[in-house]
Amino acid sequence: MKILYCAAEADPFIKTGGLADVAGTLPLEMKKQGHDVKVVIPLYKLIDEEYKKKFEFEGSFYVDLDFKHHYVGVFKYIHRGVEFYFLDNEDYFNRDNVYGEYDDCERFVFFSKACVQLLRYIDFDCDIIHSNDWHTAMVNVYARDFAKGDPFYESIKTVFTIHNLKYQGVFSSNSLRQTDLSPMYFTEDALKFYDAINFMKGAIVFSDRVTTVSKTYADEIKYSFFGEGLDGVIRQYHYKISGITNGIDTTIWNPETDKYLFKNYSLKNIKDKDENKKALQRMYGLEEKNVPVFAMVTRLVENKGLELVRYIMDEFLTTEDVQVVILGTGDYSYEEMFKYYEWKFPDKLKANIYYNNEESHKIYAGADFLMMPSIFEPCGISQLIAMRYGTIPVVRETGGLRDTVQSFNEFSKEGNGFSFTNINAHDFLYTLRRAISFYYNDDFNIIKENAMNSKNDWEKSAKEYIELYEEIIK
């Protein structure tokens, strides 16, 4: 099968969030399973020169938008057997930021149309175009529009993945002019969203199939609490929406070979995980003692459940003999909150208000528990990484957290973590205390083993995507 995979970012070239992890690893697994996959992302100024100097220039073509003729430079690089294409236009991508520019609408409309035209330029007669999130949502709209008058595009089927419904690509109705699409697209059954246009809505309407990054999230977004104003559209098109849970790249996240760990370990010698814990305590100036170490590696924003953390942290640190390690940046109020708790409990909490990839590896290996009390979590990657390293997740049952973390049952000995259901601070505190109670008995090693035995690589997810593709091209 031939697949064009379009995204705004892909690891290891450019990364601002979890989308890059997916776009950088899922196509590799599809290739491994015997399919012809090509990935397309913009050629950002921010991509490391070490990669850029290896890119091969393939030529150029032009995209017409809003009565303008826009240059598209085409570069190619083969990464782990997969062809990655980088589309160049200095006006749009020679910026200091990936997102958040004043002309994001125009930038990603240009990129989306260029992705569709790229197929003809490289003569790639693909079966599937797979786009991701609002940045490339218009790819599927253009593919449908091109198919009306061009036989080259008639048989191509489209899939769109929602990684986070919160960010939809909503722009003023005047922005429709920048797309070069007919005014007929400004209707309720197309791009119109109140008095604006909505890229993500367009992808939901015009794609052959729509996926979310977990099965539970696909159900949740049908309701107003999670639907971000699009729940009506989600319910209308429910028949073509399904969930496929993300995986992780287990070659990168592997405690046996991870170069960042203080000491490598595996399920067979899991006791060596303790050496990572002791080294982590030393690194952050915490007392090296046998107490549970809880960690959070996250963006410090409200939807990560930080209001629940704010409500219980003082009581938790006052009453429990624990240590807490934080790694991440985000909203000022939450950054200051953790700085305050570090000041108040210097022997119990270390707040690292920054992000460092190497330190994240050390924390995943050295902590005993990972806290993820998210209000909503489309999939979540941190809990998958934590389990890979034998660090036990404590989560709220939402989205991908519900799909991947099974609360431990002390009678059947099944389960790979701990969970609670309600958005309630003391339910969270109770669950933390329940986790601590198992730290001091023999079941703790069983839970760690269950977590490490959880299969969270991309193999199963890639197979599900391929099955989905096969369904729609029959």
UniProtKB/Swiss-Prot annotation:
It catalyses: [(1->4)-alpha-D-glucosyl](n) + ADP-alpha-D-glucose = [(1->4)-alpha-D-glucosyl](n+1) + ADP + H(+). Pfam families: Glyco_transf_5, Glycos_transf_1. InterPro entries: Glyco_trans_1, GS/SS, Starch_synth_cat_dom. Keywords: Glycogen biosynthesis, Glycosyltransferase, Transferase. CDD domains: GT5_Glycogen_synthase_DULL1-like. GO terms for molecular function: alpha-1,4-glucan glucosyltransferase (ADP-glucose donor) activity; alpha-1,4-glucan glucosyltransferase (UDP-glucose donor) activity. SUPFAM superfamilies: UDP-Glycosyltransferase/glycogen phosphorylase. Pathway: Glycan biosynthesis; glycogen biosynthesis. One of its GO terms (biological process) is glycogen biosynthetic process. Belongs to the glycosyltransferase 1 family. Bacterial/plant glycogen synthase subfamily. Synthesizes alpha-1,4-glucan chains using ADP-glucose. This is Glycogen synthase.
